[in-house]
Amino acid sequence: MNQFYKRHFLRLLDFTPAEIIALLDLATELKKDKKSGCEQQKLVGKNIALIFEKDSTRTRCSFEVAAYDQGARVTYLGPGGSQIGHKESIKDTARVLGRMYDGIQYRGYGQRVVETLAEFAGVPVWNGLTNEFHPTQLLADLLTMREHLPNKSLNKMTLAYLGDTRNNMGNSLLEAAALVGMDLRLVAPKACWPEEAFVISCQALAQKTGGKITLTEDIAEGVNGADFLYTDVWVSMGEPKEVWQERITLLKPYQVNMRVLTLTGNPQVKFLHCLPAFHDDQTTIGKQMAEQYDLPGGMEVTEEVFESAHSIVFDQAENRLHTIKAVMVATMSKI
C-alpha cells in the first residue's frame, strides 16, 4: 500500500526523514521516465484545483505540466478567480472543492488557510507556498543537491543561506536540514534571524538525525566549506517602500558575489536561488532597484555569480516540475 495515498503536503515536518527520501527517489524516477519518453500515467481521470491567491510562474507551470504529463486535468483559480475567504469561508470552499476535485493546491498567505483546506476538503491538499512555509521548493532543492553531488549523501552536505532568514524559505530550510541531517548555516544580521523557539525545535531534531544548524552574522564563518550557497529576494512587491530601504541597507553586506564564493574555500561550490532573482537591471523592478539603491551589479546576487558555472538555478527550477509531480502521484495514486 502506498504510504502517501490521500495524505496532505503542507510542511516538511509532517513527514519522516525516510518519507522525504522516498519522495525524492520517486521524483528521480519520474524525471528519468519523462526524459526517456516512457512515463506511465497514474493520474488519468483525476481533476485538480489550483488556488493561487498569489501569482506565480514556476509553481503554476510545474503543477499544470505535472498534471498533464500524468493524465490529470486542472482548473486554475487565480487571485480574482475565487471567493475564498471573501464571500465564502475557507471551510466552505474546501467542502465544495473537495466534492469536485481529487486534489487541491493552494498558494497564498497564512499557513492556517492551507491547513483549514486540508482539514475540510476530504482530498489531498498541497502547499504551493504560504507566508510561513514553501515545502515544494525544498523538495526541488534537495533533489538538485543530490544530482549535483551524487557521491555525497544529503546528511554529509553543507548549505549556507544568506539574506533574510525569517521568511518561508528560511523556515523550510530549517525543517529540511533537521529532517535529512544536513549542516545548515543561516548567515544573516540578527534582526533577520528566524523565531528562536522554532530554531531550537529544529536544532533538537537535527541532533537526532546527525544534522547541524548554525546561525551567524559572520559571512566568512558561515560560508566556510559550504557545498552550496543559497539566497532569495530581499523584498516582496507587496511590502511598503519604507521597508525596502531598511532591509536592503541591512542586507547589502550579505549579497552573494564572487568574494563570498571565494570565502567558501570550495572551487566547486554551487549557487542556488528559488527565483525570480534581482541579478541585473533587465526588468522594470530590477532597474528601479539598481538605480534607487545603488545596486548596479545585482541585489541579493550579482550577475557574475548568477550567470557563472557555479549557478544551478535553472536545474533547480526544472526540478520543481519533477518533485511536484512526485507529490501528486504519491498522494493521489494507490500504487
Swiss-Prot record:
Keyword annotations from UniProtKB, A to Z: Amino-acid biosynthesis, Arginine biosynthesis, Cytoplasm, Transferase
GO biological process: arginine biosynthetic process via ornithine; citrulline biosynthetic process; L-arginine biosynthetic process
Main location: cytoplasm
Pathway: Amino-acid biosynthesis; L-arginine biosynthesis; L-arginine from L-ornithine and carbamoyl phosphate: step 1/3
Binding-site residues, L-ornithine: 168, 232, 236-237
EC nos: 2.1.3.3
Binding site for carbamoyl phosphate: 56-59, 83, 107, 134-137, 274-275, 320
GO molecular function: amino acid binding; ornithine carbamoyltransferase activity
Family the entry assigns: Belongs to the aspartate/ornithine carbamoyltransferase superfamily. OTCase family.
Role noted for this protein: Reversibly catalyzes the transfer of the carbamoyl group from carbamoyl phosphate (CP) to the N(epsilon) atom of ornithine (ORN) to produce L-citrulline.
UniProt-listed HAMAP family: OTCase
Protein name: Ornithine carbamoyltransferase
Native source organism of the sequence: Yersinia pseudotuberculosis serotype I (strain IP32953)
